[in-house]
């Protein structure tokens, strides 16, 4: 995936490079890729795509990316007081977060 996808997302004031690095990989690696206009690795691309999908789902549930990021960064009892954003590093964690968001979209408490 081209690094411009990361640049485009960081242009949104709701999302920081630090937020992306929590899911995609080390901040220094992302900074280097940005500086060199490099591509994300396949694993980084996969994690970035998962992050984008969950961010868009949460934005739909909560009415925008600012509220979505607030929710993703708030510890949830349902996740043993982990922040949902930290679960997005794995497929299983991502599915757990998506499940809660889908329930919220259908009227259950997130």
Where would I find each of the regions flagged by the language model?
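Non-transmembrane "mature" sequence context
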Residues: 1-110
């Amino acid at each position: 995936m081209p690094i411009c996808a990361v640049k485009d997302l960081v242009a949104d004031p709701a999302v920081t490079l630090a937020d992306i690095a929590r899911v995609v990989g080390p901040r220094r690696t992302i900074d280097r890729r940005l500086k060199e206009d490099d591509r994300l690795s396949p694993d980084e691309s996969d994690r970035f795509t998962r992050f984008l999908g969950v961010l868009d789902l949460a934005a739909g549930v909560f009415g925008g990316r600012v509220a979505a990021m607030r929710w993703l960064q708030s510890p949830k009892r349902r996740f043993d007081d982990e922040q949902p954003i930290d679960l997005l590093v794995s497929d299983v964690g991502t599915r757990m977060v998506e499940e809660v968001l889908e329930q919220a979209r259908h009227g259950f408490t997130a």
